[in-house]
Amino acid sequence: MNLHQTVEHEAAAAFAAAGIAGSPVVLQPTKNAEHGDFQINGVMGAAKKAKQNPRELAQKVADALAGNAVIESAEVAGPGFINLRLRHEFLAQNIHAALNDARFGVAKTAQPQTVVIDYSSPNLAKEMHVGHLRSSIIGDSISRVLEFTGNTVIRQNHVGDWGTQFGMLVAYLVEQQKDNAAFELADLEQFYRAAKVRFDEDPAFADTAREYVVKLQGGDETVLALWKQFVDISLSHAQAVYDTLGLKLRPEDVAGESKYNDDLQPVADDLVQKGLAVEDDGAKVVFLDEFKNKEGEPAAFIVQKQGGGFLYASTDLACLRYRIGRLKAGRLLYVVDHRQALHFEQLFTTSRKAGYLPEDAKAEFIGFGTMMGKDGKPFKTRSGDTVKLVDLLTEAVERATALVKEKNPELGADEAAKIGKTVGIGAVKYADLSKNRTSDYVFDWDAMLSFEGNTAPYLQYAYTRVQSVFRKAGEWDATAPTVLTEPLEKQLAAELLKFENVLQSVADTAYPHYLAAYLYQAATLFSRFYEACPILKAEGASRNSRLQLAKLTGNTLKQGLDLLGIDVLDVM
């Protein structure tokens, strides 16, 4: 159930009874549980419009809520706030229903969409580095939540598999195989660096590389076969990283830049035909009045270079048109570094004008900040090099495994390694996903691997704590009526019933940290409940009801962490 929506509906009916129908309720959870479960903040705005005394109007609303099946009490506070307490019978009934529902009381959206989400999208011919982490895990989490809430999700890994760098790589590979027929690509990163040195230092080699670019773009079969070697090796490296991270990205989700090659010229010509693109110094350019350059003139969105070459803008236009026209997307999400914001704003504006992005479809730029080191600079190795993502994940598992062994010396090596991988990978992902994606954040091993505070290990341990209760519980009845008598039982119940609203917020806004914050709140509330309300020592209906609350807490933590792409363990 959507608890927020249910309470808001009751409040709206009370507003109507008080003569202010249609005024925004402005419902929020209370910051202090002693004041109740929710607070209505919309009366003062309504009173100003109606030219009434806000406290008197608030009292009318509170009186209209008296005897409500959902609201136990409504008390006016301050200049016109209304604090609401929910009926324990209402909470108990809905906890019982959620516990006995395969989706834990979370309904699917009434308005499902086909959503195309573009994330990860590394440039190929290099190994993935830490700069690819945020897009990969943020996009994965958003796509999971969108699917769980009932949408059709099409994942698109828009890899950079085309461009001038491949001419350089093919030229260097041909050169190496000429000297050594048995030469094979092994270390992709090292090979790329060596090729780049040759390209920068040898003009003749650079000319050869450019010739291979022309052959590649012309469809030369021999050059295409060599190009495919780089693509296949790069994608296998990327898939290994995705598998380690537990992402849902699969090879069939790859839709690289090369996929749209045949559409680039038609798109450029179409923009000219529609009067959007004009010739400017031999290039085809869309001038956008909505954006200004430094001189205050309309910004130039170049769709074809002088000489006929194409750019990212060309590919992105063709790609967007394909996703709307062929994939039938109603919503497009691009999970990309926030520094690309202007490019995507111009892309969406051009696409809207060209008719590629119809009025009933949405395109959203899901920007994110930078992962920083403790020195406040972008995260690097001690030598200043970019950190390979596979190395970062290996270190995470090693650190977590050492920590697990330290806490549980009796664990066998295999069990410690299994727990270490789950904790280590989970810690890296949660440290990112628990932050507002638009912010930069500091990468800190000690903080993310801590079993205290808002971390993955803390939430994973909270889940194992629930499981330990049921290993000792013996018989209990999930179908028996739920009874809530203690304040912390009610608080925990109310929190668990907010799950649907939180997931809908994540689906609507693409901010996974809302879910992380909710799970942390639920886990800390369960910890307080566990200490204050003995579960196994209780008797009768109270014992069974507390077990029901514990079970739904465990279910919610497991499902919620899964939607963040994080695994749980029964024992840690």
Swiss-Prot record:
SMART domains: Arg_tRNA_synt_N, DALR_1
A cellular component annotation (GO) from this entry: cytoplasm
KW Nucleus (keyword) present: no
Keyword hit for Transmembrane helix: no
Signal peptide positions (record): none
Subcellular location: Cytoplasm
Protein name (database record): Arginine--tRNA ligase
Organism: Neisseria gonorrhoeae (strain ATCC 700825 / FA 1090)
CDD domains: Anticodon_Ia_Arg (cd07956), ArgRS_core (cd00671)
Locus of motif 'HIGH' region: 122-132
